[in-house]
Regions:
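Aromatic-anchored, charged helix-turn/loop surface patch used as a conserved interaction hotspot
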Residues: 9-11, 18, 24-98, 148-163
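Charged, compositionally biased N-terminal leader segments and the immediate start
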Residues: 1-14
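Residue-level signal for inorganic ion chemistry
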Residues: 16-17, 110
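Conserved phosphate/anionic-ligand binding catalytic regions in large, soluble enzymes, centered on
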Residues: 18-19, 114
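Residues that cap or delimit alpha-helices
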Residues: 1-4, 47-51, 133
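C-terminal non-catalytic interaction appendages of large macromolecular assemblies
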Residues: 91-160
Length: 163
């Protein structure tokens, strides 16, 4: 049974609560969390490209030696869990260089669901994905955004279960 309101899901999409709001406005009832997540994906997929790009550009770069000032608490926690706050100088330099190259090529930041990954795995994904075409990478970045949102939803629900 789905007993949540839209405010509960604030922050699941990085600085893009319009997705949750629009999904709640479009759908009267959700059967369960899986159904809700599917409807969130539909909301993004049906949105115009400028909204999709806005969603992507609202995500922070993977910074290594995390620069806290512009990160949401969710992003800060996720990047710390992947060890980005403890990366070596070489890893930091590589991430910085790759961020610049990726942004130059695609005009949005590299996005990956970092939960469960380490710095080496993130860099490997970076190296693979920077070779993608724009259209492929746009869709890949959006898939990663949905993974991040799904993880955040699950964490919010688990936090309720612990109370």
């Amino acid at each position: 049974m789905f007993n949540y309101n839209k405010d509960f899901f604030s922050g699941v999409y990085e600085k893009s609560d319009w997705i949750v709001s629009e999904t709640f406005n479009r759908c009267i009832k959700f059967n369960n969390i899986k159904h809700f997540k599917e409807e969130l994906i539909k909301t993004v997929n049906k949105s115009k490209e400028n909204l999709k790009l806005s969603l992507l550009t609202s995500h922070p770069e993977l910074t290594g030696k995390i620069e806290v000032k512009n990160l949401t608490k969710e992003s800060l926690s996720e990047q710390k869990s992947a060890g980005l706050n403890k990366c070596s100088i070489e890893e930091f330099d590589k991430l910085h260089t790759m961020n610049n190259s990726y942004n130059k090529k695609f005009n949005f930041p590299f996005i990956i669901a970092v939960s469960g990954l380490n710095v080496a795995e993130i860099i490997k994904n970076f190296e693979i994905r920077i070779e993608n075409t724009y259209d492929f990478e746009l869709n890949e970045a959006i898939r990663e955004v949905h993974k991040i949102a799904s993880i955040r939803i699950d964490q919010k629900i688990k936090s309720l279960d612990r109370k």
